[in-house]
From Swiss-Prot:
UniProt-listed InterPro entries: Hunk (IPR034671), Kinase-like_dom_sf (IPR011009), Prot_kinase_dom (IPR000719), Protein_kinase_ATP_BS (IPR017441), Ser/Thr_kinase_AS (IPR008271)
Name of the molecule in the record: Hormonally up-regulated neu tumor-associated kinase
GO biological process terms held by the UniProt record: intracellular signal transduction; signal transduction
Organism: Homo sapiens (Human)
Active site: D186
Keywords: ATP-binding, Kinase, Nucleotide-binding, Serine/threonine-protein kinase, Transferase
């Protein structure tokens, strides 16, 4: 079970360099034993929870008194996650106020649904969704940089290079939305926030719409958004498309470069505003703007949506990509997914081993971007860990042994310091300690020499004494081994090298990901149905007799159950008729596998029903078929005439082999009463001539259930 809210609390804040007594100094080390995260990351000081001003607690969140924003039916407040100690933004929607607006009531949960469909570094991350009787809560990441509009008010206007950076991030986020089929419809300066790294974060998907993905009818026919940022086709109440977001980006770009809006009318009138947009009567631009910026801005504010560029064309603009060194966004099938390699192993291990969550639940929730408490814990812990690593001068302080192993990709030092630490380890004092170990321990120690240890060790080691020749040989072998490890494809330490588990080790045989909880996350290949041609039946040679071969199966065209089919979807071409060869005489049945012994396509072999259950007369047919006889068409046809020289048998008699092969007319009781009777062969040809030679065994009884399953009872 997941840990309680107070399980991860520390008595004192684990701030770097903080003073305290002997008991306080021992607490971080105790928290680090057997842990996968630093104590500063995994623990929450009690003072942080006590000093946070709040008026309510909902789930694992404290709803703070500080208000970040307010709308007609919703308020955004600062919150605190009690399990991680991280601050979040909580949007509280009042259901009573929302009921007054039919549009809001109908689409109350749409914002949360849309935000779970997307994941982008310039879009706020939705962490959790909670609902009570009176309120609906959306928990999102907090952007401490504030609103971009406040920054424009302070500076009056932004420089062209800074505005270009913001506009490119905004276009990248909108392009990601459009690839996911989402149109924002309310892009304005007030909905652009800044994070701690001064990057754009797009918020407020309350008016966003999804192009038919979420099942909403007529998605592009409503009047929405602020009129100053709305495209002309929106003001004219015409049908519109994703290019309305391109127009809004142009308005935001004009506001960043000038500090004002491009189209304004006094007094305000929608008709006059629309006419000014159509006539391209834009307010004057600053003279210091470059030609490329002006040309790009005018293309975004094109009133004709046909001539206006789409979001992909805008992202490829030359002025926008000038001096840009970032990565080009790649087209992905699922815009809300991340790859397995992007997960933080330390955070996943902490959640599974310390907080008690299942490994498969954590991985599946994070990869699928499903807003719940698991995603919130992972995101906040990972963000806290990144902030801890970036703020530490020496990342090895307060880190435990396992953390260095599982975070080797992030904790790996540069090459220069890496080689320097290796040379330090080759000095006499440390090598004397290595030589005292056993050979196996010495080999393991040599494999782990590449880790950059703490600075305290460097002060105690001598700096001038040279190692002996045997020690130099060990150094060279160690360096060669480390180079091989660097060249390997795996970015995490192997289990055999460090004696630890790798939760993201892919097995080549089963194509699965082995987790630390002995569970397996399947990574199946694409399931593409393919037609498998049925092999042609064996044609007897000119010298062969009518007696079938020993190895010929007694059951032909067997219907396989779902349990006997492999992972690939096979579409088998079966013959029109299915004849099941079943003998009621004391003979032995050839050993078959489970798929051949199963007559029922729905139940596995060996499943039995009570014998008194009546058997459906059309499910199972009993036939002795001659291999040399021509194939017969299946249908409601009359039985072939019986030869005149043979004894006549009634049509429904169990001794009439041919009539039983087509129309079994007796019930389960008759078959059970006749099961000990011997079959009367026809006079023209003995029955033994059409059967393969079989070894005599003990008599067997056949029991039939309603699902056509056959089970031998000795």
């Amino acid at each position: 079970m997941p840990a309680a809210a107070g399980d991860g609390l520390l008595g004192e804040p684990a701030a770097p360099g903080g003073g305290g007594g002997a008991e306080d100094a021992a607490r971080p080390a105790a928290a680090c034993e057997g842990s996968f995260l630093p104590a500063w990351v995994s623990g929450v000081p009690r003072e942080r929870l006590r000093d946070f001003q709040h008026h309510k607690r909902v789930g694992n969140y404290l709803i703070g008194s500080r208000k970040l924003g307010e709308g007609s039916f919703a308020k955004v407040r600062e919150g605190l996650h009690v399990l991680t100690g991280e601050k979040v933004a909580i949007k509280v929607i009042d259901k009573k106020r929302a009921k007054k607006d039919t549009y809001v009531t109908k689409n109350l949960r749409r914002e949360g649904q849309i935000q779970q469909m997307i994941r982008h570094p310039n879009i706020t991350q939705l962490l959790d969704i909670l609902e009570t009787e009176n309120s609906y809560y959306l928990v999102m990441e907090l952007c401490p940089g504030g609103n971009l509009m406040h920054k424009i008010y302070e500076k009056k206007r932004l420089e062209e290079s800074e505005a270009r950076r913001y506009i490119r991030q905004l276009i990248s986020a909108v392009e990601h939305l459009h690839r996911a089929g989402v149109v924002h419809r309310d892009l304005k300066i007030e909905n652009l926030l800044l994070d701690e790294d001064n990057n754009i974060k797009l918020i407020d998907f309350g008016l966003s719409n999804c192009a038919g993905i979420l099942g909403y009818s007529d998605p592009f026919s409503t009047q929405c958004g602020s009129p100053a940022y709305a495209a002309p086709e929106l003001l004219a109440r015409k049908k519109y498309g994703p290019k309305i977001d391109v127009w809004s980006i142009g308005v935001n770009m004009y506001a960043m470069l000038t500090g004002t809006l491009p189209f304004t009318v006094e007094p305000f009138s929608l008709r006059a505003l629309y006419q000014k947009m159509v006539d391209k009567e834009m307010n004057p631009l600053p003279t210091q703007l470059s030609t490329g910026a002006i040309s790009f801005l005018r293309s975004l504010l094109e009133p004709d949506p046909v001539k206006r560029p789409n979001i992909q064309q805008a992202l490829a603009n030359r002025w926008l990509n000038e001096n840009y060194t970032g990565k080009v966004p790649c087209n992905v099938t699922y815009p809300n997914r991340i790859s397995l390699e992007d997960l933080s192993p330390s955070v996943v291990l902490h959640m599974t081993e310390k907080l008690g969550y299942k490994n498969s639940d954590v991985i599946n929730t994070v990869l699928s971007n499903r807003a719940c408490h698991i995603l919130a814990i992972y995101f906040l812990l990972n963000k806290k860990l990144e902030r801890y690593l970036s703020g530490k001068s020496d990342i090895q302080d307060s880190l435990c042994y396992k953390t260095r192993l599982y975070q080797i990709e992030k904790y790996r030092a540069p090459k220069e310091s890496y080689e320097a630490s290796l040379d330090t380890w080759t000095r006499d004092l440390e090598f004397h300690a290595v030589q005292d170990k056993k050979p196996k321990e010495q080999e393991k120690r040599g494999d782990f020499l590449h880790r950059p240890f703490s600075k305290k060790l460097d002060k105690n080691l001598p700096s001038h004494k040279q190692p002996s020749g045997s020690l130099m040989t060990q150094i060279q072998n160690t360096k060669a081994l480390l180079k091989d490890r660097k060249a390997s494809k795996s970015s995490f330490p192997d289990k055999d090298s460090f004696g630890c588990r790798n939760i993201f080790r892919k097995t080549s045989d089963s194509n699965c990901v082995a987790s630390s909880s002995m569970e397996f996350i399947p990574v199946p290949p694409p399931r593409t149905p393919r037609i498998v041609k049925k092999p042609e039946p064996h044609q007897p040679g000119p010298g062969s007799t009518g007696i079938p071969h020993k190895e010929d199966p007694l059951m032909l065209d067997m219907v396989r159950s779902f349990e006997s089919v492999d992972r690939d979807d096979h579409v088998e071409v079966l013959s029109p008729s299915h004849h099941y060869r079943i003998l009621n005489s004391p003979v032995s049945l050839a050993r078959r596998n489970s798929s051949e012994r199963t007559l029922s396509p729905g139940l596995p072999s060996g499943s039995m029903s009570p014998l008194h259950t009546p058997l459906h007369p059309t499910l199972v047919s009993f036939a002795h078929e001659d291999k040399n006889s021509p194939p017969k068409e299946e249908g409601l046809c009359c039985p072939p005439p019986v030869p005149s020289n043979g004894p006549m048998q009634p049509l429904g008699s169990p001794n009439c082999v041919k009539s039983r092969g087509r129309f079994p007319m007796m019930g389960i009781g008759q078959m059970l009463r006749k099961r000990h009777q011997s079959l009367q062969p026809s006079a023209d040809r003995p029955l033994e001539a059409s059967l393969p030679p079989l070894q005599p065994l003990a008599p067997v009884n056949l029991a039939f259930d309603m699902a056509d399953g056959v089970k031998t009872q000795c």
